[in-house]
Amino acid sequence: MIRVTALSNARLALAFIDYMKTQGVDMELRPQGRYAELWLAQDEKLAQVESALEAFLLDPQHPRYQAASWRTGSLHYRGETGAGLRGWLPALRQQAGPLTLGVTALCVLVFFLMALIGDDRVMAALLYPAGPAQYGQIWRWVSHAFLHFSLLHLLFNVVWWWYLAGLTERYRGRASLAILFVLSAVVSGMVQSHFSGIFFGGLSGVVYALMGYVWWHGEKNPGGPLFMPLGVIVFALLWLIAGYFNILGIAIANAAHVAGLVTGLLMAFWQTRRGQSHGYQR
């Protein structure tokens, strides 16, 4: 057994142990006074553990480590850190950059404007272009993403946006997030309008683009900061299936979801092919 390090915060020590377990490394926590010592039985994996520990100490609240605790069933860690709403919200607040916050604020503002002055007036200004006469109104190609038609619709999209866009802005930069937002809004709008006309709205096409983008980067760089928990991937796929088979009994912009997902995957694929998969910001 090798003593790797000692941490003064036992909760963080457990989180790191959970994460290393998902990487195929078994570690042991030994209380030592006010400290929690981390011990490793597999000598040959010491370099891997030290590298992972360095990244962990830079950002111990990253959702990757909480996701690892969920996957390994570490109830002790979840209970002490106040998982769920109390555990996630501080991490979400930390990672939201200016663009993430700005889009969130615009979505909320537009929603309240619709309630105050009426849906028709707001939609008339922000809907996808109805034809060539409106093609020059450039904002319409993306402004449909800010329209939400119920509180549940708004909350669903904004929470996912906050989480995924926050990760992307923090680790891939504001420019990457801005490009992905514009591309996915335009492409998902074009595809959805082909199937259902212009009366649609919501951030979900962009959200699905972010899901594809983050997932691809996580697959290509497993040790990097961008990561999609398996539960989120399963949920996204089930939501797509439910929409196509009308299981939920509500109107869902299925074409926009698929178009957004493909856009995000393609942008991540392009970046990783150009050798940008490790170009993370800190």
From Swiss-Prot:
Classification via NCBIfam families: PRK10907.1 (NF008155), rhombo_GlpG (TIGR04239)
PANTHER family registered for this protein in UniProt: PRESENILIN-ASSOCIATED RHOMBOID-LIKE PROTEIN, MITOCHONDRIAL, RHOMBOID PROTEASE
Active-site positions on this chain: 204 (nucleophile), 257
InterPro entries per record: GlpG_N_sf (IPR038236), Peptidase_S54_GlpG_N (IPR022732), Peptidase_S54_rhomboid_dom (IPR022764), Rhomboid-like_sf (IPR035952), Rhomboid_protease_GlpG (IPR023662), Rhomboid_protease_S54 (IPR050925)
Function: Rhomboid-type serine protease that catalyzes intramembrane proteolysis.
One Gene Ontology term from the biological process aspect of the record: proteolysis
Assigned EC number: 3.4.21.105
Subcellular location per the Swiss-Prot or TrEMBL entry: Cell inner membrane
Gene3D superfamilies associated with the record: 3.30.70.2350, Rhomboid-like
Enzyme's top EC category: hydrolase
UniProt keyword list: Cell inner membrane, Cell membrane, Hydrolase, Membrane, Protease, Serine protease, Transmembrane, Transmembrane helix
Catalytic activity: Cleaves type-1 transmembrane domains using a catalytic dyad composed of serine and histidine that are contributed by different transmembrane domains
GO molecular function, one term: serine-type endopeptidase activity
Membrane topology field: Multi-pass membrane protein
Name of the gene this protein is made from: glpG
GO CC terms in record: plasma membrane
Family statement drawn from the similarity comment of this UniProt entry: Belongs to the peptidase S54 family.
UniProt keyword Cell membrane, yes or no: yes
Protein name: Rhomboid protease GlpG
Record-annotated membrane-spanning stretches: 97-117, 145-165, 173-193, 195-215, 224-243, 248-270
Principal location listed in the UniProt entry: membrane
